[in-house]
Structures are given as C-alpha cells and as structure tokens.
Regions:
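Substrate-recognition/cap regions that form aromatic- and gly/pro-loop-enriched pockets
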Residues: 334-472
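A contiguous strand-loop segment
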Residues: 35-133, 153-308
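Bacterial N-terminal signal peptides that target proteins for export
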Residues: 4-19
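Bacterial N-terminal signal peptides
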Residues: 18-28
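Histidine-centered catalytic/metal-binding microenvironments
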Residues: 453-565
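Glycine-rich, aromatic-lined ligand/substrate-binding cores of catalytic
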Residues: 235-389
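Sec/Tat signal peptide C-region and signal peptidase I cleavage site
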Residues: 28-34
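Short, well-ordered beta-strand elements within core beta-sheets of diverse protein domains
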Residues: 137-144
Length: 565
C-alpha cells in the first residue's frame, strides 16, 4: 500500500509538472505571436471599402512603416530572404522582372495582407524552408494585384521554397473581395497545406492566433480554395479518419485547447460582440470564449449590426473587454487607477493551481497597428489608404497614409530609431513615453488621451475627403505626378501634426497629473493658480479609489495601517 501511495504521489507531481509545462508553452506562444485581425467586406462598410485591421503585437517589434518603391529587375535576379521575426537569413528566391510599390501591408493596387499566428501541430513546422510568414506577406504584395492572385502566389512560394513558420491565418483583401487563408507546414516535407475562404459580402470576420476555419465547401472555387492534399495529408498523419465532407481544417491541424479559446478566440468574441450587437448572440458563445465549451464554436463570420467605418473599426482595436465578464479593470491587479494591463508573464501559479491574466485586443506590446482601406471606386493612387499607428492601440491614434506616396513620413521612417536605439523624432518612442505615463494613472489620463484620439481621427476623416478630391482633379487633368506629390504631402503633414500634438500632450499630462495629483484648469484650458499671480497652482484634486480597492488594501495590510485612538 505504501508503495502504491508513493507511486500515486509521484504520478500526481508528474501530471502537475506536465500541466505547468503545457501552460507555460501556451503562454509563451500567446506572448510571442499574439496579433489580432478584423476583416470588413465592402458590403459591410459605410463607404463600400474593403478593410482589414492588424495589430502587430510583439515585445521585440519596433513600430515603423515599411516602404518599397516599384522597381524593375534584370532577368535572372535573385532576392535574399530574411526571417521577419528574427532577421535570420533564410536563403534566396527568384526575383520577378517588375515589383509593385508597397507601403506597410498594402501595395499600389490596393491589395492588403495581414496575419495572426496560430502555431498548430508542432511536428508540422519545417525549419528548413525559406518563405517565412512575414516574407510571404511582403514579397507577395510586391507581385500580386488581387486577393486571388495573392493566394496563388503564396501557394507557389510554399510549394517551391517551403514554410519555416508555424500555422498562420492571413487576411487578404482587394477592392472587391476579402479572404481568410489558413496555412500549416508539412513537417520535413517541402510545401504546406492550406484552405482559403472568401468572406461573403456584407459580413465581417476576425481571427486572433487560433485557426478559425472548420468545415469548408469542397466544390465552390468562387468562395473556397484549398490544396489538393489538404484532407489526404491529414489522413496520412492520423489527424482525420472521417468522410471528406466532415473534414475540419482547425480540428485536424490546430485543435483548440483551453488556452487557444481563452487567450485567442476570446478576442474574436470581443470584436463580434462590439460590431454585432443585435445580430451576434455574445451570451450564447460566452462559454466558448471562456474555454469551457469548445464544441460551441463561433461562426467564421457575422453580419454587423450597422455598417462599419474606419473610426468604429479602429475603436474595436482599443478594446479591453470593457463591460463584459472578462473586464479586468476592477480586480486588485488593476490597482487604484483601474489599469486594464498586466505585465508579463501572463501566467502564474498559486498553491499548485495555474492562473492566467486576460489577453485583450489592445495590449501594451504592440509595435504598429493599422486599419487598411481598399476603396475600389477611386483610382489606385487615391484609393489605397493605410490608417497607421504605433504602440498600444488604446492610447494611440492612427493617421491616413496613401499607398502612392513617394516617401514615408519622418516619424514612421524605417531606420529612425529601433528597439534598442532611442530617437526623439520617432513616433514609436514618443507614443511609448506618453502611454507609459498613462499607465501610472490610467483612469485619469486615458479619458484625456481618448478625447485627443477621437478629435484627431474624426478630423482626419474630414480632411481626407478634401485630399481625395484635390488629387482626383489632378488625375483627371492628366497630372499624375502632381496628384501623387499632393497625397505624399498630405500624408506627411498629417503625420507631423499627430507627432507634434503628442509632444504637447507629453508636457501637458506631466504638468496636470504629476505626483498623483490632478491640477485644476480654467475653461480656456489654462491651469488655475491660487490667486497670488506667482504661478502657484490652486489646490490639486485627489480622487479616492473605489471602495473595492480600499478593502483589498485593508485585507492585505490593514492591521499595520489601522489608525489608533
């Protein structure tokens, strides 16, 4: 009996270690490759544009706007490929004779490609391939005009050069169509298997680091494309044994565990909850988002309650599960200023039980983010716009940048600073400084920042109409060069205005909220003085934290703090 008890205790310890290792691995995956995309078809948008959002979330990614002008190349040229995440040299591929201009994740033909990483089965990663997921995006943008062309080119890259990344979900949109393409490697075999589904017009979709394509039509090439061996390969690996029509890409290649639901699908749930109130029953899928009921799967796409605009879409990217059961502004970890952030690592253990913090759409480690717009009713020089921002989406604004520009605004230029090199003219470093101050007194500072964000973005929506009209007249008069110069100037000027406003905010916030106080202001925005006329401020305001926070302090340290008689 003693031997049996000893064995059982050993088994219990081993099981706990395994669970902790699994949790640690999942948390590492979420932290390393945690991004969010929302996709809006033209029939679901206010102005008839196709839109894609992307938050590139990484603790090692610098926020800058990539730019590659159109170019011609000698026949037989090669292109060096470097892994986007690490900078590691992966090899060479054949270059084409002409490449298109790219600005961020868009090109001159208004094609958009964004991604989120889901990993999938570990044994399917091919470490010897050349085309990592970042290279697939940016090289494909240089070669494709439409979403369908992009899918075909990505497939050619995968089968020819191999795929050294984990499972990926790509958002691919052009002037007319929006697609989700999901890819996994084939282990030591060259190539990859994938499936791509077109989002029906009038609908929206989203993905956030978990495969979302389950069953798909096998004979509908207008709406669904896939590799010929997507099912047979799963059979050969023992991932699937049923009928072809019952095949689920996600279940075969990236089966969702608790972490995938709680840390990833919950973000999709949040986006659907915001944009689909009245058409999407969020309560119905709450147990799925919490990770309790993996069989209660959410749909791949939904119809939004109302048509979606750039501003509404940008605001989705600022979500922290506010006013939902996942809202984490009011537990003790939020502090007295109700900060909806938890510093890494995401998971911890207490008394042998594992816990994890929330992972919302908005997060502190965003390098850059955007709302990309493909406006097919306008010429390509004007129609492609990437509303670009850096750092945490909840405390930063996006500014419109046309994809026909001839140079990137200085504050977003590649080489203007880096993750280990500070630059005073870099938007990434400026926004990080302001945001880090906001993290100190979040529920005081965030409303101020949000008002500034709203004013800037709403103002940009008005100004871009004027910029569109001005450039269109030039194009219609045959003055393409003038039109492009005008759009380049507008993009640079608006970016500079954003940068300068945040410089002012940095100073203002420090003066107003220094040392945990709130300085009083006059109606004209100036700070009140005490009446002496000597620059001494009026008595500052000190707000009192919620009773829940005070009770937590008393529970933790009350005896030492109790006021005596």
């Amino acid at each position: 009996v003693k031997i049996l008890i000893k064995k059982l205790k050993t088994m219990k310890r081993t099981f706990q270690i395994v669970i902790c290792l699994m949790l640690a691995f999942w948390l590492g995956q979420v932290e390393a490759n945690a991004c969010t995309n929302v996709i809006v078809t033209k029939g679901a948008s206010k102005d008839g544009s196709c839109m894609v959002t992307y938050s590139a979330d990484s603790h090692q990614l610098y926020g800058e706007l990539y730019y590659a002008p159109a170019a011609t190349w000698p026949k037989g040229s090669k292109m060096e490929i470097y892994e986007w995440d690490s900078g590691r040299h992966l090899g060479q591929i054949n270059q084409v004779e002409r490449t298109y201009q790219t600005v961020g994740n868009m090109n001159e033909h208004q094609l958009i490609i964004a991604e989120t990483t889901f990993g999938g089965r570990h044994e399917l990663a091919n470490r010897h391939g050349i085309m990592d997921y970042g290279s697939l995006i940016y090289v494909t943008l240089q070669r494709a005009r439409t979403a369908r062309e992009a899918i075909a080119i990505i497939d050619e890259f995968l089968q020819t050069y191999g795929f050294p990344s984990g499972g990926e979900s790509f958002s691919i949109a052009d002037k007319d169509e929006c697609w989700i393409m999901e890819i996994v490697g084939k282990g030591e075999e060259l190539g990859a298997v994938w499936v791509a589904i077109r989002i029906p017009d009038g609908y929206i979709s989203a993905h956030a680091n978990q495969s979302r394509i389950h069953k798909f039509p096998l004979n509908d090439p207008e709406n669904c494309l896939y590799t010929p061996d997507v099912i047979s390969f799963a059979r050969s690996k023992g991932y699937f044994t049923g009928k072809d029509e019952d095949f689920s890409f996600c279940d075969a290649y990236a089966p969702a565990d608790w972490g995938a639901l709680r840390g990833c699908e919950a973000r999709v749930w949040a986006a659907f909850n915001i944009l689909g109130k009245g058409t999407f029953d969020a309560d119905k899928y709450l147990d799925f988002a919490f990770g309790h009921n993996p069989d209660n799967k959410m749909p791949l796409y939904i119809k939004p309650t109302e048509k979606v605009g750039v501003k509404e879409l940008a605001d989705v990217m600022r979500d922290h599960f506010e006013d939902t059961p996942m809202d984490f502004r009011y537990d003790v970890g939020a502090g007295p200023h109700e900060i909806p952030y938890r510093w890494r690592p995401m998971g911890f253990e207490v008394d042998g039980k594992a816990y994890r913090y929330e992972r919302s759409i908005a997060t502190q480690q965003t390098g850059f983010w955007f709302v990309a717009q493909s406006r097919g009713w306008l010429p390509d020089e004007i129609g492609g716009v990437i509303w670009f921002g850096v750092d945490d989406a909840a405390t930063s604004a996006v500014t419109p940048i046309y994809t026909s520009i001839t140079e990137v605004p200085e504050c977003f230029r590649v080489g203007n600073g880096g993750m280990t090199t500070y630059s005073p003219t870099s938007a990434f470093w400026l926004f990080n400084k302001v945001t880090h101050f906001a993290y100190l007194f979040y529920n005081r500072v965030e409303p101020v920042l949000r008002a500034e964000i709203d004013a800037f973005e709403l103002g940009s929506l008005k100004l871009i109409k004027e910029a569109d009209a001005k450039a269109l007249k030039m194009l219609q008069a045959g003055n393409r060069g003038q039109a492009v110069a005008s759009l380049t100037e507008f993009s640079a000027k608006r970016s500079e205005q954003l940068f300068n406003r945040w410089l002012e905010l940095e100073e203002f916030l420090l003066v107003k909220f220094i040392d945990g106080n709130i300085k009083q202001q006059n109606e004209d925005g100036t700070f009140k003085d005490n009446g002496s006329g000597k620059g001494i401020p009026a008595r500052p305001i000190n707000d009192i934290p919620r009773e829940r926070w005070l009770r937590a302090i008393v529970k933790d340290h009350g005896e030492a703090m109790k006021v005596g008689k």
